């Protein structure tokens, strides 16, 4: 080893010890006859003094000219800092190293930015020079946190007798969800592999094979439009179990959440985690991943709206749509008309709402609003009672379709929670949403699509609905929600080949297509398949949430941009003609 200690290891008890340190020059100061260098590595920072009597003039001069971010090696002796020169902000702040040997291992050019600067450049520049960005303490802490969480996960499932099995990266395209990333085959011209969107089918096959507890930290790929919390390639903790029901899976993951929170954050989580059905989540919060760190529950006032003279409310109710609202407690005087106009524009532009109606609850308990003249006192009193309105409250309403009121009020909840600081930084709220619909209707395609995936089993009591009313059929599905983000999703799987074929048919797949795409699964289900189920936990998102960050790219070492590009390597890039010829491919001009 070139070094005897890291830059964060030395303490007062090491005074007098000879040491060798290696690291990056974080900063340097020339104090006339002596050079002070703050030497940095991922463990911390140590002050190094290059000056007499330990160092000669040539060594001092060399140290004075070393560029910041250069990698150096120093040998010296640990000493107490001078009185009044200690730094309580550093764990090494009571000591310094008096250097008697100084060596530049790799000199640095002037970097476009430095790890310690407070005014960070734009994200594109940071991603282009990711090797510099990863030197920042915040980035290193995020990746260390990631490593801790993955280790915690692996340890937990090892304790529960899970077998870690690697599944293939090169598989077959089964275009049912997001677009696949395709890989051309050189030895099978005109044929393609697909990179896995998940190990779903392989892990089900493992259950049929008798591996009753499977787990894997799996790399997955989806060619979809990106957001701040999505990447084209991502990591998930994937597991499957035989002879279980949803209660077993949920209970197992409850334990993992508690273990991770305690071990990584030092927080206690009360178990079991709260649950609600999909129907309840949409009704109360307008989202299948509700943020429960704050209230602002949605209330349906359609029954009253239908009786009023306010044409917007009554017309909406008469058309079979909904009037729903939220009560922003003690906020009547916190929002000016201009601010309410901004919120109105927000729900219109982002969610397609027609407008935002509002009432202020006055000190005498009456409701005031520019539209209040369209309501008689009886109806205003009913609205206030339904909303739980009290003096000082601000009541906000959307009148629209179920979908628009859900999305609009859910988005409004989140925005208001941020503006009003309705939750604490670092707060962690975990819950389950269960009993999702099996299917949703794709109006453009004129057919059903699976809400989760085509291998999800229906609730036992809803099995007859597969034939009678598929849209009413509920799935044995469960999502883990952390702070309003989906942190994992799982289902109990279909283990009967006849039911699986029936679901394929409902999804518009004829027998030949189903056999072509999923024949191996249908065959496996005919040879003794146990009841089984599982879940996939998004590792990247878990780390983001447990680290209290907003951008998933902050917890991935080498992420892609929102255009799925790698700014550092230049991927994706063109390939030469010889490579294309080997793969029997040619390129065509992109459509504009």
UniProtKB/Swiss-Prot annotation:
L-aspartate binds at residues 176, 222, 452, 493. It holds the Pfam family GAD. Its EC number is 6.1.1.23. GO terms for molecular function: aspartate-tRNA ligase activity; aspartate-tRNA(Asn) ligase activity; ATP binding; nucleic acid binding. Residues 200-203 are annotated as: Aspartate. Aspartyl-tRNA synthetase with relaxed tRNA specificity since it is able to aspartylate not only its cognate tRNA(Asp) but also tRNA(Asn). Reaction proceeds in two steps: L-aspartate is first activated by ATP to form Asp-AMP and then transferred to the acceptor end of tRNA(Asp/Asn). It catalyses: tRNA(Asx) + L-aspartate + ATP = L-aspartyl-tRNA(Asx) + AMP + diphosphate. Belongs to the class-II aminoacyl-tRNA synthetase family. Type 1 subfamily. Keywords: Aminoacyl-tRNA synthetase, ATP-binding, Cytoplasm, Ligase, Nucleotide-binding, Protein biosynthesis. The keyword Zinc-finger does not apply. It comes from the Bacteria. The record marks 31, 84 as: Important for tRNA non-discrimination. It is found in: Cytoplasm. ATP binds at residues 222-224, 231, 486, 538-541. The gene is aspS. HAMAP family: Asp_tRNA_synth_type1 (MF_00044). The keyword Repeat does not apply. The lineage of its organism: Bacteria, Pseudomonadati, Planctomycetota, Planctomycetia, Pirellulales. One of its GO terms (cellular component) is cytoplasm. It comes from Rhodopirellula baltica (strain DSM 10527 / NCIMB 13988 / SH1). GO terms for biological process: aspartyl-tRNA aminoacylation. This is Aspartate--tRNA(Asp/Asn) ligase. Homodimer.
